Amino acid sequence: AEIPPTFGVSSKMVQAVIAGGRRALTKAVEGAEDSTAAGARDLRAKRVTARDVVVGITASGTTPYVLGALGYARRRGAVTIALTANRGTPVGRAARITIAPQTGPEVVTGSTRMKAGTAQKLVLNMLSTTAMVRLGRVYDNWMIGVALTNRKLRERGVRILCQATGASVAEAERALRQVGDRLPVALEKLKKRVSGEGV
């Protein structure tokens, strides 16, 4: 949900499916993760192709739902990544790439939402940030694709322009107004002014 506003990309670029569907985000749907067919069905509904990357997330590395999803994605030619807390698992073997941060035993045995889940979230942040950098959605280390949809984000956009170009706050605000709050366009406009190419 944070990738489109942070990097200015379509919400279709990064999508998520979860065993049990959207309802599972607020209420446990017991047994939903036990179906390989459901994992495949949910990815089929997303129309996965060879142009996609599918990341299967499971701390144990044995979740049938994830196995089904990765199997379907692999058959469609997608790049498959297993993100698990254990090495040498069925999910790891089902994927082309395995990422298995070694977090050690949980504080509460079996409660993988703690260390394993936290490590997986960090890995997902690394994957998404790296992808957006590679796609040019970042200038130096500034998130120039950010959608300036509220006051806080607009102020951030102004700061980015000031830091990246040496423009004053007034110049940055004016540049944003002139281009309809499109931060990358304002950045190019101010860079040309600073380099003497004109506006």
Regions found by a protein language model. Give the residues of each.
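Glycine-rich phosphate-binding loops that contact phosphosugars or nucleotide phosphates
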Residues: 1-122, 131-133
